[in-house]
Design a protein with these regions (language model features):
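Phosphate-end processing signature that detects enzymes handling 5′-triphosphorylated RNA
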Residues: 1-201
């Protein structure tokens, strides 16, 4: 996989809203859904090397796949859209992923420093995702309905949220779909990432 500038909207949810969002998506032509069981472990050094660089490093089991991912913070917007650089590859371990990510465009210096450091698991996020691929004309986006648990330092909290991620086509159409979904379901923006919420426990 290659570098992408990930663009997504994120909203708070409960079981009722997840069901309503699925109905909204299912009523649209060209929707396809699949279920993925996600087990994410996030890593950093004791002195917060990745946090210092506004980066997140995770190893995630996605059904039968193991994926290493590095995200670099970019911008957030008031209406809930988040944009950040994302580099990811299939990897059997965190170290395997860190060795491969620079080939895909991830910062070589940061990956080398992380490889040489004592990386520790700082939190975990386990959830089931219902992923729905939506097509509107030539625009493709993916809606994710996530429900599970955030865990950190022996504490846990429920996770329930809706995401809409841009895949291809017109960004204007993507933003319009997000606005329609948020308005129809009266959604509230989720301003913080899964990692940030887990670390706040």
């Amino acid at each position: 996989m290659d570098k992408t500038m990930e663009k997504e909207y994120k909203w708070r949810a409960d079981e009722k809203l997840l069901g309503q969002a699925l109905l909204w998506a299912s009523s649209r032509i060209g929707s396809q859904s699949r279920t993925i069981n996600m087990e994410s472990s996030y890593f950093d050094t004791a002195d917060g090397l990745l946090k210092e660089h506004q980066a997140a490093l995770r190893l995630r089991r996605e059904n039968d796949r193991s994926v290493c991912c590095m995200k670099l913070r970019n911008t957030d917007t008031p209406d809930g859209m988040r944009a950040h650089e994302e580099y990811q590859c299939e990897a059997v371990s965190l170290l395997d992923g860190l060795r491969r990510l620079p080939e895909l465009g991830a910062p070589n210096d940061l990956c080398e420093r992380a490889l040489a450091a004592d990386l520790q698991e700082i939190c975990t996020v386990s959830f089931r995702r219902c992923a729905v691929l939506l097509q509107e004309g030539d625009t493709v986006c993916e809606m994710a309905l996530d429900e599970g648990k955030l865990r950190h330092n022996g504490k846990s909290a429920p996770l329930c949220e809706i995401e809409l991620e841009y895949v291809a086509g017109s960004e204007d159409t993507f933003h319009a779909l997000a606005a329609e979904l948020a308005q129809q379901l009266d959604l509230v923006v989720e301003p913080t990432s899964k990692l940030a919420r887990a670390m706040a426990l």
